[in-house]
């Protein structure tokens, strides 16, 4: 049984031809032709999630894991607007999503008809392509769909298909019509002068490679390790870089918290080479803006952000292809102490870090130390934003873990939904480490029939936005409560309502007891809520930073 609407059939056929496999549908009437078509087609896996904002982040999590486009289908009106936070995240994180919105016909727009807004080009600032379709315009619709889907073969990100349907909406046929689409293959040729780049590279005494959000890539790790044989090369990674090597520096912030001007000057790179997604560390961004490199090269097929205001080269290829060609041209006999200087600071800082953490009082910082140690090997970890991802940056991660965080727009709004979508799509056990505000903000993420039983959610509940006691400004103002938004909420009743096992910890002893059972197999997903002292967390962190001097 398929929709009688030709426009719905065209969209469904395009999704099949362009190998969309998963479709996340939110309920509504205007999208009935699409819902009927997708749910009855054997080539699609269809999932139903009521809350459109959660649905979009859930789809984002699936696409993040599969690295393939996932489609979203919703009704007309404000339902579509609820997709926007996830669309913005997908745009800046370059994650492929196909947004399919049902719409009213054009003659019903702006005349006071119900559930009707101006949907055409609604995401124009954060979308790769908007295909505004029309009923009874098959040829043009096919051309627009071909262009939209072909774009996903060239670059990654969200596309929007807006489909107006007039009533009746529920008529069906037994067979779909045939449609043709033109697949435009990506242009894989790149004009990169590796010899010219190598000449500049080899003449520089201080080269820094800074890696942002990245998928695990063992072959790339090997190439980076070879490039790092050059003593004038330093590789900095973050928690979300997923590239692990003892030679790489992965706890950037605690390394540069307390450096002097003279030390910063000596570490100022001649060439900065960046790849991957957005950088978490504000400290390294400030350092590279205050002590600008002579050259900044960025590797990315689509775009290059001028994060440090000195961008000189956009190298349009993927990171593996670049280093596969480039490492052969590197001069490894460069006489430089650049890497050894940073390594010296790293050893000093790591010793001070370990010494302080051993005796640190119960706090967010101490909790992080224990939590990161008990996450099982070869798990996937999703961190929420704000203080959570920043705390994670202070610790060396278990190299067997795969780490993700929504750093495209760095919002707290969809971390739980993204993690659950990712858990649904991966074979690995999933742990989400989240703050209380991020968790409660996205609590509808638990209203979901697709949560694997091996999902583990760790909530670090410091009774509000603890980061606002850490960053300069809010604490000195007379409006701290509006920044921190203190509360006395717990996740206990949410767990009961949505079928999660629930446990709590209030101090180090109870936490050590709870984590023993937390990762044991269960027929339900689990939540561990850890309560920390909101009046002490910022003081402990500041003492930690001072200890690194």
What does each of the following model-derived ranges do?
Residues 22, 65-74, 80-82, 90-95, ...:
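Structural signature of the thiamine diphosphate
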